[in-house]
UniProtKB/Swiss-Prot annotation:
It is a single-pass membrane protein. The gene is mtgA. This is Biosynthetic peptidoglycan transglycosylase. It is found in: Cell inner membrane. Its EC number is 2.4.99.28. The chain crosses the membrane at residues 12-32. Belongs to the glycosyltransferase 51 family. One of its GO terms (molecular function) is pentosyltransferase activity.
Amino acid sequence: MLRNLLLRLSKLLLWLIALSVLLVLLLRWVPPPFTALMIERKIESWRTGEAIDLTREWRPWRELPDDLKMAVIAAEDQKFADHWGFDVAAIRAALSHNERGGSLRGASTLSQQVAKNLFLWSGRSWPRKGLEAWFTALIELMWPKQRILEVYLNSVEWGDGIFGAQAAAQHHFGTGAPYLSAHQASLLAAVLPNPRQWSAGKPSRYVNNRAAWIRQQMRQLGGSHYLQRIKPNHPEWWPSWL
């Protein structure tokens, strides 16, 4: 009986692994219609009785401004072009900081944040961290870096019910994502650690200072030239949709 149970569990695990691989492969080309975080926020609103409208409009890579791409990289993951999903040095630094009793510090790369926002629930449990590592590895293996950043910018939370760059640009600045200035892009990146408490449209002194630091980091990283490092290197005959 125990043997049969283990066999069934093994088959179930193999099916779940196969489904996760197929899902990540599909989302390399298909825009995700929603994310796990969006579902979580909706459930949260039902439980609290506070209605919330989720706003999100997909914008393809070519319509997302370089300033926003660079602002997010400068703020969240400056080694994005170099790592394979995990910034080991940042993880070690965060663990050391947390062990010393400081405020909890994260070390999530953009790839890890995409995995978490798309597929997983919030929390710090070990099972969730294990699944995050699994999905991060799949994303890095199957998606080019441009796709990872494209999905991130279209899925990240930028306020209550505000998801993605287009909704954020309209909500905070009354404009479309393609028309964001470098200053506006840096403000959006500055609030990412706490987008439900901080406002890009009405920034505090701290947010303004952080945005100024982000603009400085953007210049030090080389501005839009940095983005050439995450451009897929394909031969001329390679289909554009791959």
